[in-house]
Amino acid sequence: MRRMSAAARLLAAALVCAAAVPLYVFLHRPVGYALLVAGVALAVLVDRHLARHLALIAGGLVVISTMSLRADLTNAGMTRFAVVLSAAVLLPYLVQRYVYREDVIRFPWRTGQPWSRFEYGYLGVVLVLGYLLLPVYFIGSGSYRNWPTVTEPAEIARLFVGVNAVGLWDELFFICTVFALLRRHFPMWTANFLQAVVFVSFLWELGYQSWGPALTVPFAVLQGYIFQRTRSLAYVVTVHLSFDLIIFMILVHAHTPALFDVFVTAPAIR
């Protein structure tokens, strides 16, 4: 009986997280919503506490699904992203804090401890791998075309703000919210792979398509692991935004080859 209950709890969480695939990859909202309802309903039957937390995740996913995630650098597009993505973080946070009276979702910016050699080393590895691999992916696969063409200074500035703002939001939602809620009920690696499904699905609609998941899956899993290890939002944000800085430079270079022409692995731009 205990094994059946554990399996049902895992299935409930898997249904909620798997809903991100039809919601953001296949853009089939009804299927995604059905999976969310099924996952939360199953959790209600087997573990009410889990159901409360899965409902928070489901609520955030529904909020995100109300808009297209395709990059849009217009005033209206950036405002829409800011409002909707902020709501997707604030809704679960406020409900768990003031309705559930819990303190599961937290944003631990500083740990009070200096970075370890591991942390400096990991950041260095991320920068080197990003510099070498990301040009091959974005330019070689043509995925850079999933972002608007930027040639003017104002457009480039908007792209910089947008890429970094979404990168910060990724950590607030996928790590500090989804991963933290799942971690209350499942072992670290189980919770981590479940949040990675949501993380990677979101990134797919955002533009990381073609063979992008070969990069985004390990990145999402590693970010969860690093947060679990360091307990530092500041550190995982630093890693993420360092990665995003390279992405920004590649996107600008792909549209305007004379700019940021520093990538030795960049294929010829088609």
Label the predicted regions.
Residues 50-54, 152-155, 186-193, 209, ...:
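Membrane-helix interface segments
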Residues 21-99:
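Alpha-helical transmembrane segments in multi-pass membrane proteins
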Residues 72-85, 93-166, 257-268:
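Juxtamembrane helix-loop-helix connectors linking adjacent transmembrane helices
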Residues 1-33, 158-163, 181-185:
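Alpha-helical transmembrane segments and their cytosolic membrane-interface
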Residues 30-41, 82-90, 156-160, 169, ...:
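Membrane-embedded alpha-helical segments of multi-pass membrane proteins
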Residues 5-22, 56-63, 123-132, 192-195:
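Alpha-helical transmembrane segments
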Residues 192-196, 200-204, 208-267:
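Functionally important transmembrane alpha-helices
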Residues 111-117, 168-194, 228-232:
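Membrane-interface helix/loop boundary segments of multi-pass membrane proteins
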